[in-house]
Amino acid sequence: MTLYLTSDLHVDHYAENRTEISYFIERYLPSSDVLCVAGDTADNPKIFVDFYRLASQKYRQIFVTFGNHDLTVRHDDYFMQNPFTETDKKLSWIKEKLSELPNVTLLDGTTAKIGKLTIGGCMGFNDFSVGSRTWPHPKEWLLNQWQHWYDNVHWRYMDNNPGAILKDELRKLRNVISQKPDIVMTHFIPTAFGIPRKYEDEYSNAFFYFNADEYLAKMKNKSVWLAGHTHDTGKKVLSAGRNKITLLLNPVGYPMETKGRYSLKDRATAAMIKL
């Protein structure tokens, strides 16, 4: 059995109809038995669902979590093709449509099994613990900056209260980790790794990462944690006691980020698990 691990598909930046979605699948997603997507399938809910309707014909099983772009809704002059003005209603509709696809599993604080593997996940959320390495800012300042950040501007979710959102996502994550999964998927990144040097001094790092030491310490040996959100690749093996845990970032990203910047073949090799 083979599993391909990825994130940040942003399909609606590549495709507007089913024909273009099919091309995207063949162009950017290699063949495997299982596809794992750690968030940011699409802002557009129709394209989100159509993508999985088509991808489910290629893969034996698909596991997916939500990402920050999946939570966006129509407001003012933004996302006018999105019929939803409340994030909860959008997510409920997506869940309902995905439930019609027997080989697509949405992980939202839940786990599922395929063969002997247990896979679990949720979106996760940032905790403002990471920022600029050279010019650190207090949490209060970062919270204020978050008011102008993409998520707060385009979500209508849990009153856009970052403390409440974090608490809810960590509750989901605790449930996932308690099941001792072989693969964990979150969109937000569980520790500050994979930050490109050019971004090390960006305060916006605070909106990508969270401190997951408590959860990493409880993971089983040779497990994998797939994350996304950043559009840069990364791989790191952590030691948690006697256990080794692989952290993996393998996004698709936006069209201008894919052209000539990386080899699809190399990506497939780096993020393909063979059992």
Predicted feature locations:
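N-terminal active-site segment of His-dependent metallophosphoesterases
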Residues: 1-64, 70-76, 274
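Beta-strand-turn-beta hairpins that frame and shape the catalytic cleft
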Residues: 1-4, 111-121, 181, 237-246
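Active-site environment of divalent metal-dependent phosphoester hydrolases
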Residues: 10-16, 42-47, 69-79, 111-114, ...
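Short, flexible/disordered intra-domain loops and linkers
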Residues: 74-88, 197-204, 260-263
